[in-house]
Amino acid sequence: MRYLRSSLFLFLLLLLVTGLAYPLLTTVLAQWLFPTQANGSLIYRDNAVVGSSLIGQSFSRTGYFQGRPSATSDAPYNALASGGSNLAASNPALDKQIGERAAYWHQAVSNQQPIPAELLTASGSGLDPQISPEAARYQALYVAQARGMSLQQIQQLIDRFTETSKPTFIGQPTVNVLLLNLALDEEKPLP
């Protein structure tokens, strides 16, 4: 009986600590220290949520920058279906996907430069919101023509939204596609 009582006490104590006290403490600290991040890094426009800076979105309309292809199968950028495509480099399905994406970019962008790899291949999560500045510059003329803006204006926006990690030796510069497209809409909305 003594072992049962001490086991039950230990069970209840651990249940309270790990099931109530610790989650409550971490939630309160996160809301106090990092409120934006704790709530999903949501982006608001006109008091409405338009997305998260952590999750990519599909921009299929002409005049918007495109992010990395999504690997989610049922719907593009579905966070509930997050995961890589898991296609091996030798898989013919991967070759087909890359070929279709390359054909799209050759048709959409009259640019003779090589297509950046991240515009052809999905990320590990299939949800990346960022592209490299090079991938953004590859699309710059396409976006400028669709919006009736100068290439220089588009380049300045890309430069303004290029983020580098701190310290700089970790990671590469990136451009958040959602933030860049929102800035484009503020600068010159599509008709």
Curated annotation (Swiss-Prot):
Regions annotated as coiled coil: none
Q: Which domain of life is it from?
A: Bacteria
**Which InterPro entries has this protein been placed in?**
KdpC (IPR003820)
Q: Name one GO cellular component term.
A: plasma membrane
Question: Could you tell me the membrane topology recorded for this protein?
Answer: Single-pass membrane protein
- Record's keyword terms, sorted: ATP-binding, Cell inner membrane, Cell membrane, Ion transport, Membrane, Nucleotide-binding, Potassium, Potassium transport, Transmembrane, Transmembrane helix, Transport
List the subcellular locations. Cell inner membrane
Concerning NCBIfam families, the annotation shows: kdpC (TIGR00681), PRK00315.1 (NF001454)
Please report the name of this protein according to its UniProt entry.
Potassium-transporting ATPase KdpC subunit
User: Which gene produces this protein?
Assistant: kdpC
